[in-house]
Amino acid sequence: MNKTSDEAVDDDPSVFHCTLELRTEGDWCRGLVRVDEDGRVLFDEWVGTRALIASLLGNTQEPVMTCSCTVPECAGFYDQESRVSENLVHWSLRYEGRDLDLLFDRNAYEDAALAILKHFRSHPWEDAEFGTVPYEYKEFEDFAKLVDNMLASSPRLAEKWNAPQIATRPAGGGS
């Protein structure tokens, strides 16, 4: 864990080259972490939107993988942090007693993370207990303001946000 370079040891069983995808089921939305090499789903869990935004802007020790109740330990995730380099986004975490390093191509990660945020931003929730709710927020406006501040602070992310390829339900998502 805590490797700092863009180079990963290919034969290290704790290092996974991954993709982040938006997964929707009806009104439910969560992140899906898929391992590229064989298409295996590593995690199909809630992705915390505060930490997702922080990971887009830089490094964070906020838990990215969590439970819908926002308690990462509830879903078995511990000691999480994310780091961003020029080409990679790197999540380090402990899951089921193993230290794992999840590496994402930065551009693909940004596109997927923005799609997840855009889904929430464009689908205000109606049911704060069961709908498409980022549970970290009491009011939709709090979430919307955080997204707007992120976009205002990063012209690059704002340009990607406004590009037509960032759809609210990209290919590879659920129904």
Kindly give the residue locations of the regions a language model identified.
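Intrinsically disordered, low-complexity acidic regions enriched in Pro/Ser/Thr
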Residues: M1-S175
